[in-house]
Amino acid sequence: MPQRAAGNDHRRAGSIRGVTIRACVVTISSAALLLFAVSACSKPSSSPSSDKPLPPLNPRADSLESGFGTMDRLVDAAKKEGALTVVGLPGGWVGYKEIIARFSDKYGIKVTSVVPEASSKQEIDTAARMKGTAQAPDVFDLTLEVAVANAKLFAPYRVTGWSDIPDEAKEQRGRWFAAYGGYMSIGYDPRKVPAPASYSALVRPGTIVALPGDPLRMASAFSAVMAASLGSGLPDAARGVDLFARLKKGGMLGRPDQATAVVDWDFMNAARAASGRGAAAWRVTIPKNEVLAAYYMQAISADAPHPAAARLWEEFLLSDEGQNLFLKAYARPARMEAMEMRDTLDGDAAAKLPEASGDPVILNIPEQDQAKSYVTAHWARMVG
């Protein structure tokens, strides 16, 4: 998806197993943006034949084949660099603590995490501030909007499993591409809150609802407001802001640590259920017909101080091993369907994903821009 042009068909979707989404984000008109797609079922690019002449080593190449020839040569080049710097990867987000440890142990590469709580925009700002230093970020994990807006800052690279990533979830040359995604959800304490069938059902005396942060600053919180804005599959920021204004007015809006219900990505609410609260005290539901979904994109800095290690990192994240680590943390891998068809998907982990039904929606970029303008103008006055 090399351009920002977008259509408006965000309502229709196919069956849901991982995530199936119909949404126009860039370069497509009424096409599906899929985490779970037919196009994801083709075989990944194979490694070059052993009798094929190896290319000159190029750590900044746009593919394994063109720059390294074999995975072993990429691994050797990355090991010689010996380091990788990541930004905006908190350990509790989609299993990154384990993912970083596994990568470091497997390849003997020291991973330095800078500004782990950075937002996507702050990741880009951090890279600009640290540009030219050995500590500058090599790789990014970004929302789609930030990835598209900053594509010129990224190096093109197509991972080995490129063909398993839906065409609509990657920039054509490889400047950014999906690694995982999820649905917005409601996590709730069933001892105190009846299972909410909709976001509006949260407006109930005795319920304390929380967002994961400030929607003016945090993408997850903004997405939570927009999930509550859906009506018949159509986003309306005013509807979402009004819902939280009613919660605030009724004394039903609070902090996550005091909440009986939290609106957040399903992988975050599922992690809450699995740790601390326990499954008996915390459940996760994705309201039917109010299903908001999103991808998170990977990108390599064009100025990466450790270009081979950066490419090895992306190969690892999109490998079966890396994708299953995301799945273990309740995120939905970009290559999920292809892995399931090849019997390389962790079936036990997949069975633990929150169930979703209905037609998923992903906001196209013009819709995001319009909604953010509304939320920015009205949130402080109406919700505070």
Please describe what each predicted stretch is:
Residues 2-38:
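Sec-dependent bacterial lipoprotein signal peptides
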Residues 41-51:
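Bacterial lipoprotein signal-peptidase II cleavage site
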Residues 55-59, 359-384:
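Conserved C-terminal helix/tail region of periplasmic/extracytoplasmic solute-binding proteins
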Residues 56-71, 79-98, 296:
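Extracytoplasmic "Venus flytrap"
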Residues 76-83, 101-109, 128-132, 145, ...:
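Sec-exported extracytoplasmic/periplasmic mature domains
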Residues 85-100, 112-128, 132-261, 272:
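Extracytoplasmic ligand-binding site segments that recognize negatively charged/polar headgroups
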Residues 167-168, 181-185, 240-247, 277-307, ...:
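Periplasmic-binding protein-like
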Residues 292, 296, 301-363:
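Mature extracytoplasmic/periplasmic domains
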